[in-house]
Structures are given as C-alpha cells and as structure tokens.
Amino acid sequence: MKSYKLLTPGPLTTTVSVKKEMLFDHCTWDDDYKKITQEIRAKLLKLARVSAGEYTAVLMQGSGTFGVESVLTSVIGKKDKLLIVSNGAYGERMGDIAAHASIPHLIYRQDYDKIPDPSVIEMLLAENPDVTHVS
C-alpha cells in the first residue's frame, strides 16, 4: 500500500508510534482509561487557570467544526451577540452555524490571505456595544 502525506487541516498524518498506540482498544470503564481522562481534564483546568470547584472540562470527540459548533451553541445565550472575525473557511462556517442556530451575530470578513485589521475590530465593537463574544 502506498504511504501518503495528508496535507489537510487536522492531525491526520501520524507517526508510527502513535499508530501503534492506537492499536490498543481502550474501554471507558477501565481504570487506566478513566485515570488518563481525569488527568487531561485536570490539566485543562490548570491551563485555563480556573478552579475545579467552579469549572469542569468536558472532553468531546469530533471534528474541528464540531468543536466550534458545540462552543457557539452552548456558550452564547439568547441575549448575547457574536462578532465573527472571518478570514477563512472556519470563519465562514461560524457564520453558517450562527445563522442556523439563530445566534445574533455580525461578521467582519477579510480576504483569506489577509490578517484582520485590529482597528476595524475595535470600530465594530464600538459601533456594536451589544456584542458580548468575539470569535
């Protein structure tokens, strides 16, 4: 079989050592698996500099779009408004997700090969004081 380098977004091309580790079937009820999961969750809270008494980390499996959609549809409330800074496919997809989920939003579009201008973002925030979230 021919070996390919996958040049698409995401961690698709993996090393032999990672592939070998993936050959082992982990069960969610195994103590080793639970220990690994709890360590990851604790490290995420530490990374975010928040207390386990007030916050938790939920590990979710899915594509990048799945992760973005899960955040947009669970963090942004009905009275909130989202400013999407879009200079690529993910930004455009966030606009689609926000529209489909009836999330109040506005989009600052920039060409795919350009860096969004911070002064434009500042202006949009000043003109739209009801914006509560920026992505």
Regions found by a protein language model. Give the residues of each.
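A glycine-/small-polar-enriched, mobile loop at the entrance of the PLP active site in fold-type I
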Residues: K2-A48, A52-L59
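Short beta->alpha junction loops
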Residues: L59-Q61, Y108-K114
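Short, surface-exposed connector motifs at secondary-structure boundaries
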Residues: I76-K81, I103-H105, D130
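Active-site phosphate-binding strand-loop segment of PLP-dependent enzymes
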Residues: P116-S135
